[in-house]
């Protein structure tokens, strides 16, 4: 994995694309909190140990790599779109918006953007390549996945202090059994996504019971 993940990006360098940026997001599925996107440009000779898809790493390894990536990257940016905008424009468009905002924060203009998934970022005229499962194939996408994931987790830890009854520190807003039980018991808080099920179901049920 260590060798292959960097070899994947080098294939693009060898075709004349450099620098290359990886884009990924964290937080499309949760019932609460923002969606976060990150974009990362790594040096040609980058060789970060244990770099992989953030979902395949322990929390401790992600946090260590988070700092290494920020120190190693030629450029990077992280942006978010909050739950209110997610409800207004839908999660897919909110994800594109977060990615667009992150791209526009870069000081370095890449020759190519590698995007995790099968959808290009709408509204951007830059050269884009979609990579299904890219966070496990491409070093720069894997790096972006880690920055996005750790950044979002840190935000959710802060929200956990504001809204302790939901225990966001444990599930980061995902729809775990404990989270749904807390929703049913305490209702929603300001960072819940009102258009997501079962949040909207719980809201409807609460209205019926009034």
Curated annotation (Swiss-Prot):
It is an enzyme of class 3 (hydrolase). It comes from the Bacteria. Residues 18-208 form the RNase H type-2 domain. It catalyses: Endonucleolytic cleavage to 5'-phosphomonoester. GO terms for cellular component: cytoplasm; ribonuclease H2 complex. A divalent metal cation binds at residues 24-25, 116. Manganese or magnesium. Binds 1 divalent metal ion per monomer in the absence of substrate. May bind a second metal ion after substrate binding. GO terms for molecular function: manganese ion binding; RNA binding; RNA-DNA hybrid ribonuclease activity. It is found in: Cytoplasm. Its cofactor is Mn(2+); Mg(2+). Belongs to the RNase HII family. PANTHER family: RIBONUCLEASE H2 SUBUNIT A, RIBONUCLEASE HII. NCBIfam families: PRK00015.1-1 (NF000594), PRK00015.1-3 (NF000595). This is Ribonuclease HII. It comes from Endomicrobium trichonymphae.
């Amino acid at each position: 994995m260590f060798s292959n993940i960097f070899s994947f990006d080098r294939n693009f360098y060898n075709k004349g694309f450099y620098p290359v940026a990886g884009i990924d997001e964290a937080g499309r599925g949760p019932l609460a909190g923002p969606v976060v996107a990150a974009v990362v440009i790594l040096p040609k000779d980058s060789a970060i140990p244990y770099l992989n898809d953030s979902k395949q790493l322990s929390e401790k390894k992600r946090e260590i790599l988070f700092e290494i990536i920020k120190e190693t990257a030629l450029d990077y940016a992280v942006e978010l779109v909050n739950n209110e905008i997610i409800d207004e424009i839908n999660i897919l468009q909110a994800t594109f918006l977060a990615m667009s905002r992150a791209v526009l924060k870069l000081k370095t203009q890449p020759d190519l953007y590698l995007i995790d998934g099968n959808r290009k970022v709408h509204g951007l005229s830059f050269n884009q390549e979609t990579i299904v499962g890219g966070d496990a194939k491409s070093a720069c996408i894997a790096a972006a996945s880690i920055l996005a994931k750790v950044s979002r987790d840190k935000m959710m830890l802060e929200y956990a202090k504001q809204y302790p009854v939901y225990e966001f520190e444990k599930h980061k807003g995902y729809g775990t059994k404990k989270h749904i039980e807390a929703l049913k018991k305490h209702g929603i808080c300001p960072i819940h996504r009102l258009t997501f099920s079962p949040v909207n179901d719980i809201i409807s049920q609460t209205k019926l019971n009034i």
